């Protein structure tokens, strides 16, 4: 994209004004892209080196996929019947609408008031077990939906996902009873009538379909690209180890570092999270102890024509013939499970585990990754062969063609770029290049928009694939500005600033930041006397690039960071979130990290008015008033629906699945398993085979179609 910066006058037309100021997220991305540049068909998921092979970790990939699919859909994984799929059963996302509200617990600046109470801008009285209505959306209300200055009501509440009740872990049952042994503690927030309800997460659940292409996962990117075999945090977690067999009776703890394994990093977070899937204090080794001797999916129907599991289906139709231990032995190298040694994972705890139990997090994460790598939706109308005469696939309506032009004219594809319609994908994917890039560009410096005070412009550092979109005030959820459990910044930019200040010798994550390859290198706006040579980018900044391989000296960095707005070292990190894919977006509501919009129409209104608030760091956002007509809005929604893969809509292979009973709010009465818990009500998800849903079942539909007025 051709980018230029200039002073502008306040009288300029808003839409033209936005176009003048917009620059590409990455310099290789252009504003008016050809449709063919975003077709996904033919793209392969980035390979995880040294993972699959006869002497590698995974020795039977198909068995690993089978194991991963079973684990993903098995309600036994959770302490109280929650599966991974409980939050991802509908086009990879969650369309439940009862007991899904979180009071805004990520709003740490207001932790003792609104972050503990439920306030919907609709005026409806909400709380635990509340059933969301269509009229509760959107969560930011405007007298004029086209005017950002007419806000009338808002909330820090979030539509999350219902998970587990508040309980302390005691023990698992290796056979028999599915639920773990746990002791209830009265929740300060999630209770009704003196009984604990299931908690709801403080962010909306994104789709897992096409997540295999993402360089990092989770809204805040904390699921590291490098999988360490135990936790989501990659090489940051220096205590993470796996166990190798050294003969029959001995094991050795060794580190693991698998690149392009963010899905595995993501997969190991929810099962031990006390809100999502676990009683507090349960470990992955405990989950292994619970599952290994059980038949996979022992209580759930498996369809006779399941595209992955049919060959392992038990004759009864319920579950598989194999136990999880047997599936692991088929899928993984025996050096990770064959030892008879017992391992005390926590010193002096007196609690010992088998090698297979101790490595269960690794088996779980990698198997889930192998399964989710198959969930690629590359057969939407958008992906069909292009008619040379029209420039569009056959079947595109005039409305959809106009919508694609609106999508480009409004610069939606500055963020929703590449074949996945997300710059959070691995750079090789979103740059749509067959040639392997010389390095992975994950940090940039650019002018993205106006300065809050007047119309000056500045350059800001930002993590590619994450954006500030003005969905809610920064204090409601800081997103990418958060830290890991070890106190380290999640953001690559914040890590880089630590390097520039001299507080760190190198990046915490194995990421190269190349100032010579930034849209706005430091040589653009720093004096030569303020700069020093950058030693860390030598491998990239060669030849002509050496002249721009300069960074500000530590004392200059300190002076800039002391300025209001951080001067020439401003960043786009606070309240930045991972840019989601737009594929199948018709089916994956509610939308945004807070789930505050029920429909694509509300999303388009949001972007048209320039967000929900005027962001104080407007130089780091691409969300501006667009001035769309009603026809433009309708056309844009029509185009977005061309990104729906009919296999996803009808749950045809590879999107078929076993039966699942999903917790969906509570009904009157006490839970028969625990006198302090409210009685669950359930949503039954039928098993579906490779041919997909029947005509009687009908297709999956949008989130708002399930809501009462």
Kindly label every feature range from the protein language model.
Residues 18-19, 29:
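Cleavable N-terminal signal peptides
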């Amino acid at each position: 994209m051709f980018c230029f910066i200039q002073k502008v006058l306040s009288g300029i037309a808003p839409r033209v004004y936005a176009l003048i100021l917009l620059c590409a997220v990455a310099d290789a991305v252009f504003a008016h892209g050809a449709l063919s540049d975003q077709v996904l068909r033919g793209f392969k998921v980035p390979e995880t080196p040294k993972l699959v092979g006869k002497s590698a970790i995974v020795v039977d990939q198909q068995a690993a996929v089978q194991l991963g699919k079973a684990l993903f859909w098995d309600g036994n994984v959770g302490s109280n019947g929650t599966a991974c799929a409980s939050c991802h059963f509908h086009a990879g996302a969650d369309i439940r609408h009862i007991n899904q509200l979180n009071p805004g617990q990520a709003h740490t600046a207001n932790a003792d008031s609104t972050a503990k109470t439920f306030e919907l801008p609709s005026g409806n009285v909400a709380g635990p077990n509340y059933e969301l209505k269509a009229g509760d959306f959107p969560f930011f209300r405007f007298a004029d939906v086209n005017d950002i200055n007419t806000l009338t009501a808002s909330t820090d509440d979030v539509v999350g996902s219902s998970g587990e009740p508040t309980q302390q872990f005691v023990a698992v049952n290796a056979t028999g009873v599915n639920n773990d042994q746990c002791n209830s503690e009265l929740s300060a927030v999630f209770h009704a009538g003196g009984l604990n309800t299931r908690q709801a997460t403080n962010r909306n659940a994104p789709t897992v379909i096409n997540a295999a292409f993402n360089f990092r996962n989770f809204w805040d990117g904390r699921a590291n690209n490098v999988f360490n075999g135990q936790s989501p945090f990659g090489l940051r977690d220096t205590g993470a180890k796996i166990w190798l067999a050294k003969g029959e009776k001995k094991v050795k703890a060794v580190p693991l570092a698998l690149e392009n394994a963010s899905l595995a990093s993501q997969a190991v977070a929810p099962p031990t999270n006390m809100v999502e899937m676990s009683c507090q204090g349960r470990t992955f080794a405990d989950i292994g102890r619970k599952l290994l001797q059980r038949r996979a999916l022992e209580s759930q129907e498996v369809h006779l024509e399941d595209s992955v599991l049919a060959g392992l289906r038990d004759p009864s139709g319920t579950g598989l013939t194999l136990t999880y231990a047997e599936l692991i032995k088929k899928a993984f190298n025996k050096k990770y499970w064959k030892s008879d040694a017992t391992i005390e994972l926590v010193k002096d705890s007196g609690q010992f585990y088998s090698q297979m139990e101790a490595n269960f997090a690794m088996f779980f994460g990698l198997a889930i990754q192998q399964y989710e790598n198959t969930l690629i939706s590359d057969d939407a109308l958008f992906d069909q062969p292009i008619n040379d005469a029209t420039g569009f696939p056959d079947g595109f309506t005039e409305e959809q063609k106009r919508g694609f032009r609106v999508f480009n004219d409004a610069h939606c594809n500055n963020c929703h770029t590449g074949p996945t319609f997300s710059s959070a994908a691995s750079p090789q994917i979103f740059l749509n290049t067959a040639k392997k890039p010389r390095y992975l560009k994950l940090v940039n410096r650019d002018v993205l928009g106006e300065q809050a005070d007047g119309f000056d412009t500045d350059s800001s550092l930002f993590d590619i694939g994450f954006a500030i979109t003005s969905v809610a005030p920064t204090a409601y959820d800081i997103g990418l500005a958060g830290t890991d459990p070890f106190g380290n910044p999640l953001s690559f930019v914040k890590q880089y600033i630590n390097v520039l200040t001299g507080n760190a010798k190198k990046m915490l994550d194995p990421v190269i930041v190349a100032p010579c390859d930034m849209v706005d290198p430091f040589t653009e706006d720093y004096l030569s006397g303020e700069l020093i040579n950058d030693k860390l980018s030598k491998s990239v900044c060669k030849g002509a690039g050496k002249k721009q391989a300069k960074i500000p000296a530590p004392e200059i960095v300190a002076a800039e960071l002391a300025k209001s707005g951080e001067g020439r070292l401003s960043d786009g990190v606070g309240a930045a979130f991972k840019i989601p894919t737009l594929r199948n977006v018709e089916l994956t509501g509610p939308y945004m990290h807070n789930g505050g919009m029920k429909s694509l129409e509300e999303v388009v209104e949001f972007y048209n008015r320039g967000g929900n608030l005027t962001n104080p760091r407007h130089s780091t956002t691409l969300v501006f008033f667009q001035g769309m007509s009603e026809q433009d809005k309708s056309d844009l929604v029509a185009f977005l629906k061309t990104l729906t893969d009919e296999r996803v809509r009808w749950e045809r292979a590879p999107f078929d699945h076993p039966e699942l009973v999903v917790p969906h709010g509570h009904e009157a009465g006490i839970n028969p398993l625990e006198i302090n818990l409210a009685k669950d009500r359930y949503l039954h998800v039928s098993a579906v085979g490779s041919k997909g849903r029947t005509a009687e079942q009908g297709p999956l539909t949008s989130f708002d179609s399930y809501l009462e007025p």
